[in-house]
Structures are given as C-alpha cells and as structure tokens.
Amino acid sequence: MEEYAREPCPWRIVDDCGGAFTMGTIGGGIFQAFKGFRNSPVGINHRLRGSLTAIKTRAPQLGGSFAVWGGLFSTIDCSMVQIRGKEDPWNSITSGALTGAILAARNGPVAMVGSAAMGGILLALIEGAGILLTRFASAQFPNGPQFTEDHSQLPSSQLPSSPFGDYRQYQ
C-alpha cells in the first residue's frame, strides 16, 4: 500500500516527533488564545494581553507533550514493523494502545488500561477511516478494459495509431 511507503524508521521517528510538536504548538496556541482572551479582565487591551500571555506560557508545553506522544508512538510503531516484519494498520493500533498505556503508567494500572483502550480505539478509528477513504477513492477510478501490448494479436487491417493522428491523413 502506498500509504505506508514512508522514510526509514530512524528518520520517521524524528519527523513524527517534529510534526507532533508543530501540531501541538499551533493547536495549543489557538486554544490558549481563546482561553486567555475569555479568562482575562474586561477591556480589549487586557484581553489581548491575557491571550498573548496564555499562548506564550502554555503552547510550548502542549507542543512538547504532543512531541513526546508522537515520538513514543513512532518508536513503538517502528519496533512493531521490525518485530512483525510487515507494515499494516495493526501496528498503528497496537502502537496507539501501548503509547497510551506507557504515558499513563504513573497514574496506576486502571489509568493505564483506560488510556490503552482509548489509544487503541482512536487509532483503530483513524486507520479504519483511512482504509474506507482509500476504498471509496479507488472505486471512482475503476480499471478499464485491458488492452493487449502485443501488436501481432491485432487484426492485420488495423495498425496501431498515434495519439496525435495517423500519418496517412496528410498524403
């Protein structure tokens, strides 16, 4: 499948870690901008200053948390590819569950099970949506009739023509 044709694992981990940091920082910045604006005192200057302060203090922390999640997920995913010898959706689902469990380990076994279930379910939904999207997109472009490549199988009266017209039209 083309979906899984990506760069080798050491670079994939760094790439996913950086992408997750960027998503967390931008998404966290937008969320914190609204939160800081809403929780600031009345007055546009106070609200804008509160919004900017919330962005500066919380967005990098959220980006770092996302980067840890992305790096751990990619590390487990690459390990699963190496161990199993194939790259399929089960690796991502298992990686999501293990990442959720590992990141919740400090909160106890109940939290680990809950986070593992959420991580696995979330990644299963993402992988399922990707598979459905690929199937529906490929159904839009069905394979046409297969033409023979061997010109000896064509009737003798029919010569292969050029896509730009036949040379005989100019004689």
From Swiss-Prot:
Membrane topology listed for this record: Multi-pass membrane protein
GO BP, sorted A to Z: protein import into mitochondrial matrix
Pfam families (UniProt xref): Tim17
MF-aspect GO terms: protein transmembrane transporter activity
CC annotations in GO: mitochondrion; nucleoplasm; TIM23 mitochondrial import inner membrane translocase complex
Region (Disordered): 144-171
Post-translational modification note: Degraded by YMEL1 downstream of the integrated stress response (ISR).
Disulfide bond entries: 9-78
Subcellular location(s) per record: Mitochondrion inner membrane
UniProt xrefs under InterPro entries: Tim17
Family note: Belongs to the Tim17/Tim22/Tim23 family.
NCBIfam families attached to this UniProt entry: 3a0801so1tim17
Oligomer status and interactors: Component of the TIM23 complex at least composed of TIMM23, TIMM17 (TIMM17A or TIMM17B) and TIMM50. The complex interacts with the TIMM44 component of the PAM complex and with DNAJC15.
Designated name of the protein: Mitochondrial import inner membrane translocase subunit Tim17-A
